[in-house]
């Protein structure tokens, strides 16, 4: 019997060859992880893609400094004033009356400012917005916001009007996350995780921007496709006859089954779950999915919608990785992105013949 503590044998030629193969795979895996991992954010307009990109900056790049936060003030003020103007105009269109003592404020918002707001939220303008937000007519109009185009952040900024109208106001990270501006062109966020470089590419989602998507399709490790769960009862900004959820389903089918992404991980973010959970208590998802006959609950409805998207996949060998998300909730996105990171890193290693 040989000495088990003696010098190890080199092994048979087969064992040596197998060991060399393993070392080669490890080298390939290390090389892949040291390379750049490209994540492509896709989805229709208003689905929350840009908010996800902002969260990556908060989570992985030390957030926004004061100068960067300050640069969002004008956007936030434009969102706030613009949203109130939308409500005032919608009230008139829907023939919902505004209190007599608030009609002058409504006129100033709708007529005097028009589309020429200069980005300065004066004390007088803030008071007009505060008074109108408390007006029963504006509240009734807000309850019917599925009938017109209103930013998701409207109520958040109206409720914060005293704070955001202070002379020394500096936007918080939450204020920045909720700010909305149309994404045009291509915006990239680069960050490091576990010695791997991630490049997240955000491309505008509205129809006019989608022609730019093809420029980003090469060397993509994973697609993160964002869908706004809460928009099952809304129409597109670009086309007021097309349901937003149906547009997202059609778009996901195209992206999921394109030859460009035949071997690319497909991650599905079912976003705005917080707004969705409130909305389904008032508006059934049958306004979009007439065939749905399940319970009108968050769990039942979200599971049904998730399955509708998974069913768009025509490749039985391709996996879809769905997640319910709230893009404005940093803790939720941290947890979800940790799962995404593990999926992506495992798939990257898998391509080299190794699994974590």
UniProtKB/Swiss-Prot annotation:
Q: Provide this UniProt record's keywords sorted from A to Z.
A: GTP-binding, Hydrolase, Lipoprotein, Magnesium, Metal-binding, Myristate, Nucleotide-binding, Palmitate, Transducer
Annotated region (G1 motif), positions in chain = 38-51
Q: Name one GO molecular function term.
A: metal ion binding
Give the required cofactors.
Mg(2+)
Q: Where is this region: G2 motif?
A: 175-183
Residue span of region G3 motif: 198-207
Residues with lipidation of kind S-palmitoyl cysteine? 5
SUPFAM superfamilies attached to this UniProt entry? P-loop containing nucleoside triphosphate hydrolases (SSF52540), Transducin (alpha subunit), insertion domain (SSF47895)
* Organism domain of life: Eukaryota
Assembly and partners are described as: G proteins are composed of 3 units; alpha, beta and gamma. The alpha chain contains the guanine nucleotide binding site.
Instruction: Give the family, as the similarity comment puts it.
Output: Belongs to the G-alpha family.
| Name of this protein | Guanine nucleotide-binding protein alpha-1 subunit
Provide the gene name from the record. Answer: gpaA
